[in-house]
């Protein structure tokens, strides 16, 4: 039995020492660790489109209830503007509803700094919605800073998910 295993073991060792095999393995390992910037903005993008029209679930699933921000920024990105446009259309279609825009930040920075950043993010979303026709009195803002993370972890993937503004439908 040892004669049968010995050639296979020696063949595996020679393959493992081959620089091309090592380079291929490292490339595959690094590609598996690459992060995707195109995170879904809504549950609808995940294929969860069965919601009652005019409900919070409809808003979340079919419109998108959250937008994301770059690090230390409250500027509305192009992908966020598209989501806010859909939110404005939904609010025009359902005039009996209002929203609360919750501003959030990742874990980096002080509590006070992140509360202020969350407030700037919530206000940026509100101001954008108002600029495209949503009455200001239908939009309330609140900042939670870093106090309500949706993703735990001290890495870029978690931080990216926590740099957000979430619109919650209220009646």
Model region roles, listed by residue range:
Residues 104-170:
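Periplasmic OmpA-like peptidoglycan-binding domain that tethers envelope proteins to the cell wall
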Residues 34-98:
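Periplasmic peptidoglycan-binding/tethering modules of Gram-negative envelope proteins
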Residues 6-7, 40, 56, 89, ...:
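Helix-termini ("caps") and immediately adjacent flexible loops/tails
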Residues 29-32:
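C-terminal motif of bacterial Sec signal peptides marking the signal peptidase cleavage site
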Residues 2-22:
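Bacterial N-terminal signal peptides that target proteins for export
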């Amino acid at each position: 039995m040892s004669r049968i295993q010995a050639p296979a073991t020696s063949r595996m060792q020679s393959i493992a020492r081959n620089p091309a095999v090592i380079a291929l393995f490292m490339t595959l390992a690094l590609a598996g660790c690459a992060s995707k910037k195109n995170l879904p903005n809504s549950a609808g993008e995940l294929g969860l489109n069965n919601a009652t029209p005019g409900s919070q679930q409809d808003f979340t699933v079919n419109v998108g209830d959250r937008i994301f921000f770059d690090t230390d920024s409250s500027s509305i990105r192009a992908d966020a503007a598209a989501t806010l446009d859909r939110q404005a259309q939904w609010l025009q279609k359902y005039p009996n509803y209002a929203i609360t825009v919750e501003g959030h930040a990742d874990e980096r920075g002080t509590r006070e700094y992140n509360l202020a950043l969350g407030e700037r993010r919530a206000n940026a979303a509100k101001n954008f919605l108002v600029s495209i026709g949503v009455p200001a009195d239908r939009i309330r803002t609140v900042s939670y800073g870093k106090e309500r993370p949706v993703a735990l972890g001290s890495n870029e993937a978690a931080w990216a998910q926590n740099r957000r503004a979430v619109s919650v439908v209220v009646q």
